[in-house]
Swiss-Prot record:
Pathway participation: Purine metabolism; IMP biosynthesis via de novo pathway; 5-formamido-1-(5-phospho-D-ribosyl)imidazole-4-carboxamide from 5-amino-1-(5-phospho-D-ribosyl)imidazole-4-carboxamide (10-formyl THF route): step 1/1; Purine metabolism; IMP biosynthesis via de novo pathway; IMP from 5-formamido-1-(5-phospho-D-ribosyl)imidazole-4-carboxamide: step 1/1
SMART domains: AICARFT_IMPCHas, MGS
InterPro entries linked to this entry: AICAR_Tfase_dup_dom_sf, Cytidine_deaminase-like, MGS-like_dom, MGS-like_dom_sf, PurH-like
CDD domains for the chain: IMPCH
Gene Ontology annotations of biological process type: 'de novo' IMP biosynthetic process
EC number(s) recorded for this UniProt protein: 2.1.2.3, 3.5.4.10
Source taxon at top rank: Bacteria
Catalyzed chemical reaction(s): (6R)-10-formyltetrahydrofolate + 5-amino-1-(5-phospho-beta-D-ribosyl)imidazole-4-carboxamide = 5-formamido-1-(5-phospho-D-ribosyl)imidazole-4-carboxamide + (6S)-5,6,7,8-tetrahydrofolate; IMP + H2O = 5-formamido-1-(5-phospho-D-ribosyl)imidazole-4-carboxamide
Protein name, entry field: Bifunctional purine biosynthesis protein PurH
PANTHER family cross-referenced by the UniProt entry: BIFUNCTIONAL PURINE BIOSYNTHESIS PROTEIN ATIC (PTHR11692:SF0), BIFUNCTIONAL PURINE BIOSYNTHESIS PROTEIN PURH (PTHR11692)
Family under the similarity heading: Belongs to the PurH family.
Upper taxonomic lineage: Bacteria, Pseudomonadati, Pseudomonadota, Gammaproteobacteria, Enterobacterales
Keywords, comma-separated and alphabetical: Hydrolase, Multifunctional enzyme, Purine biosynthesis, Transferase
């Protein structure tokens, strides 16, 4: 089998035109004949490149508003023809070999993500000719190179220069893998979208209804292999979505430190998603996926100092997230005070990075600033299945709160209640959070009994000498009994925020009134398992 195949003719037809002009220029300069279609052909011609329209090459015009462009034997014969085996039949029918196909597909995902997308819009953004060419070229990778990612353009030109304008079989095989991954992901998106449209077309059916598709097809790209998973006997890797428009641990850039571990990534995600809830400069410290200290301040150094006070013991070896740039003063405070696994922030100043560089094992990530949190899906694997739900982006506004106690909360109590309510959303259930002056003073996480979470929060505050009297308390779900309120009153809590909805709400409210506690119902639960 010939390892190298020369590239003499290339067909270029792309929706995402980033880098295509420079790539086409590089190919043309190396003597490669260019075929192209539609907007891509116009772009190349306008730049003065010698390019042949596919319709001129086939002798058959584009038609049906561009629906039929490349579906022609001269195109697919040129791609699928096996060199040395199909040469005679290709010559007989005037089919020239096509050595490289450069294609990316109609922007279906971007189209259906628009709020105003109609079914007709979605249908017109289903690419037919593109995937057909991609699959044809990938199938015949022994002879043809298929390029679906602009990130490969530079490396391909470098290899052409190193190998007298030819590509190795290994490269063509790698490109074919990417091509099949590309079309599989594309078809999955279309199947998911159409599967979600079943109720609109059929009304009552025996199929499971709702907005989720009947068959869920997921496509993630491997970002890195890991030394091990949650435990050392488990193998692991990190996969990310191809199109992530929101600042996240998946899109973050690591600017310092050793490779992220499985647990690092999980904990960093928890910290970053929590700190996104706050508008003021904020710091979240996480250990084992639970916040152990959260605070806001006039600047992030103040936020860090206050968050650290909540639980210095648990902060050791933790993850620290900020919603502002990591500055020199904050970096110095962290490095001089504690062992930290990961620091993540929208950005980091050069001065801050000089400080963290003194501890080379500290992982520093920058994720960019976020504007708005995007809707999406959360997944939980169970044995033999997958639970799917919307991301929990719910958060109550002041107007949605309902005071159910006799006593109204003060302005300070209300601010603290809303603060700890945001934190409770990110604490494992059963979750109890004590807060005062926009700073957590005690967090009780993951207990099977809600009252024990309340007791743990009180113990945490007492251990650090933090004053509880006059503080607010948040509970991620309703209190099934009054004992949680009694426990809160015993340590000086004066305001409680919770969803409400228990059959014993009257007893719980009565307990609050007995203790002179202001109680607020949100009407929204935030279980986290």
């Amino acid at each position: 089998m010939q390892q190298h195949r020369p590239v003499r003719r290339a067909l270029l037809s792309v929706s995402d035109k980033a880098g295509i002009l420079e790539f086409a220029q590089a190919l043309s300069q190396r003597g490669v004949e260019l075929l192209s279609t539609g907007g891509t052909a116009r772009l190349l011609a306008d730049a003065g490149l010698p390019v042949t329209e596919v319709s001129d090459y086939t002798g058959f015009p584009e038609m049906m508003d561009g629906r039929v462009k490349t579906l022609h034997p001269k195109v697919h014969g040129g791609i699928l023809g096996r060199r040395g085996q199909d040469d005679a039949i290709m010559t007989e029918h005037g089919i020239s070999p096509i050595d490289m196909v450069v294609v990316n597909l109609y922007p279906f995902a971007q189209t259906v993500s628009r709020a105003d997308c109609s079914l007709e819009d979605a249908v017109e953004n289903i690419d037919i000719g593109g995937p057909t060419m991609v699959r044809s070229a990938a199938k015949n990778h022994k002879d043809v190179a298929i390029v679906v990612k602009s990130s490969d353009y530079q490396a391909i030109i470098a290899e052409l220069d190193a190998n007298e304008c030819s590509l190795t079989l290994a490269t063509r095989f790698d490109l074919a893998i990417k091509a099949f991954e590309h079309t599989a992901a594309y078809d999955s998106m279309i199947a998911n979208y159409f599967g979600s449209m079943v109720p609109a077309y059929h009304g009552e059916t025996t199929e499971p209804a709702g907005r989720f598709p009947r068959t869920l097809n997921l496509n993630f790209i491997k970002k890195q292999d890991m030394r091990y998973g949650e435990n050392s006997h488990q193998q692991a890797a990190f996969y990310i979505e191809e199109h992530v428009g929101e600042a996240s641990v998946a899109t973050a850039q690591q600017v310092q430190g050793k490779a992220l571990s499985y647990n690092n990534i999980a904990d960093t995600d928890a910290a970053l998603e929590c700190v996104k809830e706050f508008d003021q400069p904020a710091c979240v410290i996480v250990k084992h996926a639970n916040p152990c200290g959260v605070a806001t301040g006039s600047a992030i150094i103040e936020a860090y100092e206050r968050a650290y006070q909540t639980d210095p013991t648990s902060a050791f070896g933790g993850i620290i997230a900020f919603n502002r740039e990591l500055d020199e003063a904050t970096a110095r405070a962290i490095i001089s005070r504690q062992f930290v696994e990961v620091i993540i922030a929208p950005s980091a100043s050069d001065a801050a990075l000089k400080i963290t560089a003194a501890k080379q094992n500290v992982r520093v990530l920058t994720c960019g600033q976020w504007q708005q949190r995007q809707t999406g899906l959360d997944f939980k694997r169970v044995n033999g299945g997958l639970l799917v739900q919307d991301r929990d982006l719910g958060m109550v506004s002041d107007s949605q709160l309902r005071v159910v106690s006799k006593r109204q909360p003060s302005e300070q109590e209300l601010r603290d209640a809303l603060f700890c309510w945001k934190v409770a959303k990110f604490v494992k259930s059963n979750a109890i959070v004590y807060a005062r002056d926009n700073m957590t003073i005690g967090i009780g996480a993951g207990q099977m009994s809600r009252v024990y979470s309340a007791k743990i929060a009180a113990i945490k505050a007492a251990d650090e000498g933090l004053e509880v009297t006059g503080s607010s308390m948040a509970s991620d779900a309703f209190f099934p009994f009054r004992d949680g309120i009694d426990a809160a009153a015993a340590v000086g809590i004066t305001c409680v925020i919770q969803p409400g909805g228990s059959i014993r709400d009257d007893e719980v409210i009565a307990a609050a009134d007995e203790h002179g506690i202001a109680m607020i119902f949100t009407g929204m639960r935030h279980f986290r398992h």
